[in-house]
Amino acid sequence: EVRTFWNTQNGLRAIEEWEPNCWVQVTCPDESDTQFLEQKLGIPEYFLGDIADTDERPRYDRDEGWVLIILRIPYVKEVRSRTPYTTIPLGIIMKGDICITVCNFETNMMIDFVTYQQRRGLGFTDSVDMVFRLFLSSAVWYLKRLKQIQSLIDQSKRNLDRKVDNADLIALSRLQDSLTYFVTSIRGNETLLSKLKFKLKVDELDADLIEDVNIEFAQARETAGIYTNILDSTMDTYANLINNNVSQVMKMLTSISIIMMFPTLMASLFGMNLINGMER
C-alpha cells in the first residue's frame, strides 16, 4: 500500500496529509486506503471496483459530480509469464478540488511520471492538465515497451536461425499475445481521448497537449501494428519450415519402412502352405 499526497502548484512536492487541489496517488490500495477514499473523500464505492478489474476497458464515467477516467497503461510481468507484456487499468478520479489516481499495480510509468514532473519543476495548471499528461506518459511508455518487445523478437529470431527450438517459438507466441493487448489498449485510449476533448474543460494549452498525445498514440499504434505484421509473417515462415521438415522426415521413414518390409514379405510368402514349384 502506498498513498502519497502531492502539492502540484510549483512542481511536485510530497505533503503529510490531504489538502484541497493536491494530487492523491494511491498504489496497490488496501482496506485503509479504500476507507479513506470512500469515507473521507466520498468517492462512489463502485469506482474502485471498476479500477480493480484488470479487464476494464478505457472509458469515461460521471456520477453526481464525480468523474472517473480509466485508461490502460503498459505493464511488465515476469519474463516467463504467459504474456510478459500486458496492459492494466489506471483510474483517475476528480471532483472540484479533489484529484486522485488509483492503480492496483506498481508500475515504472508512474514512478517515471513523478520523477519527470519533479524535474520539470512546473507542476500542473489543473486536474485536466494532469489527466492529459498522464495520457502522454502512457503513450511514451507504450513506445518504450514496444522497443523492448522488438528486441526480444530479434533475439528469438537469431536463436531460431541457428536452431529451431520450442522455447523460442513459445517466446514469440507470447510476444504475439502481448502485441495484441497493446494494439487493443492503444486504440481504446485513443477513442477515450477523443471523447475527453468534449467532456472536460479544455483550454488552449490543453488542446496543444492533446495534439501531442494524439501524435504519440498514433506512432505507438502504427509501431505495434508493424511489429504484429512482422511477427505474424515470422511465425508463418517457421510454421512452414517445420511442416517441410516433418514432411521430409515422414518421406524418409516411409522409404525405410518399405525397405524393411521386403524381408518380412518374402519370409511370409515362403512360409505359406502353398505349392511354389521349388518343392519338386
PLM regions: where:
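Peripheral, non-transmembrane regulatory/ligand-interaction domains of membrane transport proteins
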Residues: 1-204, 209-212, 216-219, 223
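Hydrophobic alpha-helical transmembrane segments and their immediately adjacent juxtamembrane loops
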Residues: 42, 218-280
